[in-house]
Amino acid sequence: MSNMQQKTDVILIGAGIMSATLGSLLKELAPEWEIKVFEKLANAGEESSNEWNNAGTGHSALCELNYTSEKSDGSIDIGKAVKVNEQFQLSRQFWAYLVKRNLIRNPQDFIMPLPHMSLVQGEKNVEFLKKRFEALSKNALFQGMEFADAPDTLKKWLPLIMEGRNSNEPMAATKIDSGTDVNFGALTRMLFDYLKTKNVELNYKHSVENIKRAKNGLWEVKVHDMNSGKIEHHTAKFVFIGGGGGSLPLLQKTGIPESKHIGGFPVSGLFMVCKNQKIVEQHHAKVYGKAKVGAPPMSVPHLDTRYIDNKKALLFGPFAGFSPKFLKTGSNLDLIGSVKPNNVLTMLAAGVKEMGLTKYLIQQVMLSHEKRMEELREFIPNAKSEDWDTVVAGQRVQVIKDTDAGGKGTLQFGTEVVSANDGSIAALLGASPGASTAVHVMLEVLEKCFPERILEWEPKIKEMVPSYGVSLTENPRLFQELHASTGRTLGLNEKEAVHN
């Protein structure tokens, strides 16, 4: 019946990696809780979590240069890199816990060992990379990293990239074999298959139209069943909005004070994919370069081996694009619809501040296939246009908010949890490092929204995620033990990953 209210304990909006992770944690911590999932699309993991809609990097700051900045005194700040790496370790540990208990199977279908490399050109950049390597090498989380600036070593490490390179410009690379390629789409589908066995109600082709607080304090969620055309009303004590780019409009509908003065700026991504399997087989790594001066952090170019549908692929990008949609399957009215009286000044301030980003996006949108090939040839000098196609990746909505440090309308490059003061509702906003840190971010949701249960849950959390609440940097022996044990469980035999 359309007007009948259906009660439950927890509602998860969006069937992506975040809801899948939160649902899996809750089913282990509070198995008696009833959970319902509502997803607008026909299957799980079809938007940002889909394997073609993200880079599939197990982000652990092994190769991403934007996580290590050079300070004014010339030293390297590795704080952000350590933080991202520690967060990825939590994900590894939780996935290993699930595999060990046969709750999900065949880890090779969602995670593969793959060297992570950084590559730079030019004297200044080589100097930066050497300093970065020296700074990271002192930390246990980055053990095993190698540095090379000798052409012979670079040719061995990067045959495809070094072939046909005539420039005498200095080049250098770092390599670490403990990197990973993660198929977040496959992982998301596995987690929802597991949740189904735990009697979690999965509702596909169900679009959430509104979220409002009922008089009894529960959250009332209005859902459009796209299969039958009927409207349903569901109530829950706790709601999580994990709808990727679609989270901001839903958060705004809640009316909670924490949702005010927040805006979103959508950026679309394009990748070039190689269709010549002979070329694909000549590369075996994720190789990250350095963003061009003035380009935003999400524009770091990288040439990636990927494992999609158990087949090796080669992708280069990202190229940014602009679309007013908040989701790949969204509406052209998403951006304008998100402008409210409480955030219009924040949005306008960002517009003025981010003229450089706007100019960059316009330039990116105007690029022809041949212009994109020119950028690719900076990585692969011999690349041929006919070997490469362009694929459209997912939409990312960067958060805009007022901050003490940046002032009004500051663009945030990161992932952020916004929750009500009483912890009854939470939403995940933002982009990178995103899926890689899903376990860390969902544990943050539990801490913010269930503070009264955390002490009781802590032993179980530590069983699932042994380094929860512990700094692995300060406990190198624990890191080595956990890295080795999770590697065994997940089938990440690093030596097999080294390119011959």
From Swiss-Prot:
Signal peptide feature range: none
A Pfam family per the record: Mqo
SUPFAM superfamilies: FAD/NAD(P)-binding domain (SSF51905)
Key words, A-Z: FAD, Flavoprotein, Oxidoreductase, Tricarboxylic acid cycle
Pathway in which the depicted protein is active: Carbohydrate metabolism; tricarboxylic acid cycle; oxaloacetate from (S)-malate (quinone route): step 1/1
Keyword Flavoprotein: yes
Protein name as annotated: Probable malate:quinone oxidoreductase
